[in-house]
Each structure stands twice: as structure tokens, then as C-alpha cells.
Amino acid sequence: MIEWGISAGAHDASITVVDGEEILFASHSERFSGQKNDAWLNNQIINEALKFGQPTKIHWYERPAFRTVRRLWAGQGFQHFFPSKHMKKCYNIDVPFEYAGHHESHAAAGFYTSNFDEATVLVIDAIGELDTASIWKCSGSKMKKLWSMKYPQSLGLFYSAMTDRVGLKPNEDEYILMGMVAYGDPEKYYTGVRGLWEHENLHRGCRSWRHTDNDLDIYSVAAATQKVYEEEFEKLLILAAEMTDSNNLVLMGGCALNCSANHIATKYFNDIWIMPNPGDAGSSLGAIAANNRKKLKWTGPYLGKSMGGKYPIEKLLTELHSSGIVGVANGPAEFGPRALGNRSLLADPRGNDIKDRVNEIKKRQKFRPFAPVIMAEHASKYFDLPVEESPYMQFTARCKYPDLFPAIVHADGTSRVQTVTWEQHPELYNLLHTWYLDTGCPMLLNTSLNVKGKPMVNSEKDADDFEQMYGVKVFS
């Protein structure tokens, strides 16, 4: 029975298609429209989903009526959205709809893709219908919400407001703010930033804060923001551990993408699972899981539109040896914000000029860090990882030999590591293994195959355009 899950109407729209326990397709609307963080569906993604058959039911990722009430309470006016009418009017799809709560969808997306029989689930985001953080106890088909933080208090809104305050785009550039932290002094504005968290409703931002300070050190604002976030994150972890008796933690919501903070969770839980699309886009999958309350067969994040033939290992190696930088667009696209080998820009991490060259190609700020992808069995030799494996770039780790790999080490000496095994991605693993035999280097720089402000490559035309515009060979 074909069922769809949909997340749309706020930001990062997506569709997931399942048949029983099998995940057949999951992708982001932005990959088809070309509009970064696209909030709405489009004909292209609908048609891609329809290739797997007409849906018998659609699961929606939140409860629109509750969202309408929250908007009224927040003074944002009356605006009610009817998902079923929208799908019928725009796409001629008229099937039964079933709704799940916003945080319920987050929690279910995490738990029902994990390998845990039972777990504590911690969800942290900007805002659901009313919840902004929640703690759940999940076991089998049972999900029980034990506690929640309510709007307007919100760690996600706090982080987004501070992102806006330093001149970046909220709900999009939070990862840039995280990269700025290494260049700032967390104590310089700590008292003021903590005061904003404790005393202000930050839903409409905080641009007036220190508005007369013409010499505002935005890097130190970022550092103070991260410090406050980590302090409050740890409080939530402690509360979650106290309220449950599980050693397993599922971490979900957009804040689970804060890889600089995620290591804190290892102090309180033995095993941690973060579904690689923990934000709202992942809730298209979560809505299905929340309503059906059964495990989905998670085989990895490669669930999107497929392109190319055999993974072009030899071509990639030749170009890496020749120019040091190459693109790959092959197989099903990653479901989530990280490129994990199928829509990647790969580079030799040893070159002193590689980081600047890749930043120039991607039109990014020069202070931005890049991630390494490394064979899992070599990871502990080169990085102090807080977990055994990090297949989805969800944790930072200190590099033991930063001078050897300048392209993938941030200013604070850390790297956002992706480990890979043959079972997880045999082609990427074989590429790394051959690269290692050729060079003695077991890793590559791995970043997404896109430029700032644009989605990842999603078609042969996208790949050709990238190659022609930016002078980088892209192989499919």
C-alpha cells in the first residue's frame, strides 16, 4: 500500500513515499524547484513521487488547526491552511489525510528509523504547533510525551534570532553562525546574550540589541550564542536522562544539526541516533511513522532522485590526482542537508590551497570549515571522535594531525567527520580505499555539490551547468 508523508508550508518542504515498511523515495522540494529551502511542493517532485504509484493515504507532518491557534496567540493574524484542499486543487490528488503532531513527527522519524527497541527521544527546534522542545519515551508501538517546553521560550528561535542579529539569514544560515564561533570570545557578550535567552521573546528577532554598538564583534556574538545554547542543551539532556531509564537517545529537530554541541549527549547516554534529516524536511517520513507506529527499514539516506550509472571511481581518482578537486553526482540523492558521497564535491585534504579553492568555487566565506570523509577503521587514528562512528557528519572531533590535513581542520582544531564503511556505501568506501593505497591518505574533503544559496545538484543538467559555470569536472 503506497502512502505519502508530506512536510510543507513553513520551510524545507519534502515528500516521502513508503510501501509498508519499505522507504521507496524521500526528497526535498528545493532539489526540484532550484529554490533553497523551498517551503512548497512543485509538479516535479509530485511527478517523481508518482513514479512509485498513486498514494492511498497522505500523512501530514503537523496539525494545522493547532498552528492556526498559535499564530493567533502570537499576534500573527488568522491564516488557516487546509492541506487536503491544497493537494486536490493544485495536484488533483484526493485521498484520505491523516495528521500527526509536529514534535510527534520529529520523534517518530528518529525512533522508527533507529535500531533501538526502546529509547529516550529529545526533540529541539524553533517551534512546532506550540512545543519548542520535548522529551519522549518510545518503545515498540508506544510513544509517550513526558515533558515539553512551550512557545515563546525556544532554543531554536534563540539561535535563529542571533543568526539574524549578525547579518545572516535565519532558518538557513545557522550553520554559518556555528562556523563563526571558533573566531570569537564567548565571554565578551555572554551576559547580554544570556539575558536575551532568559528574558526576551525572540520570535521577531533581536536586531535592536546593542543597536548603538558600531563595532559589534559578530564572531564573539556567535561564540556567546553557542555557549548559551550548549548550556541549555545540556540541561535538557540531564532532564531527559532523569525522566527516563534508557541508555539510548534519539536526538531530533533542527537543533540536532548543531554538530558542535552533539558530543555533550555522550555524557548522559551510551548510544545515540540522529536521523540524518532531523529537521522539518525529515518529518515527511516522520508523519508516516507517527501515524503507523512501526519500524521503517532504514538502509541509509540515499533515497532521492537517482542519476548516472556505475559509480565513476576511476574517473574520480584520475581527476583527484590531476587537479585535487572533483564533483560526483551519482545514484539516489541524499535525503537531508549533508552530501554524503552521491552529490559531493571531493578534494585532497592535504593541500594548503585546497580550502580557499573550494570556497571560491562554492562562493562561501573563507572562514567556513569543510568536512572529511574517512574509512571508519582509520577514524580513531586521526580524530578524537566522541562516538564510534559518525556516518552522517553529526559530530565534531579534534584532528590529531591538523598540519597534515589543513583543508578539513577548522580554526578551533576540529573537523565535522563523516566515517564510512563498505556496508554503508561500498562505492565511496572503495574510492577512499584506492585513494589510500595510492597516496597513504585515508580521507577526502567532502562538501555538497552546490554553491551558496542553491540546492544540491539533482539532475544531469544541474551537473553539466555546475561543471561549465565553475570549472570543476563532475562525473555521474
Which role fits each region the language model picked out?
Residues G179, D185-K227:
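Active-site cores of enzymes that catalyze phosphoryl transfer or operate on phosphate-rich substrates
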Residues A223-L249:
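Phosphate/ATP-binding catalytic cores across multiple sugar-kinase/actin-like superfamilies
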Residues Q54-F66, F97, D245-G254, G327:
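Short glycine-rich phosphate-binding loop at a beta-alpha junction
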Residues F97-A100, D215-E231, T421, H425:
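Short acidic-aromatic active-site loops that bind/stabilize oxyanions
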Residues S7-K36, R67, R71-A74, F78-H80, ...:
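Flexible beta->alpha loop and helix N-cap segments adjacent to enzyme active/binding sites
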Residues S29-Q54:
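N-terminal phosphate-binding loop and adjacent alpha-helix
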Residues I45-K57, L237-D245:
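Phosphate/pyrophosphate-binding loops at sites that engage ATP/ADP/AMP, CoA/4′-phosphopantetheine
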Residues M1-W4:
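Extreme N-terminal starter segment of soluble prokaryotic enzymes
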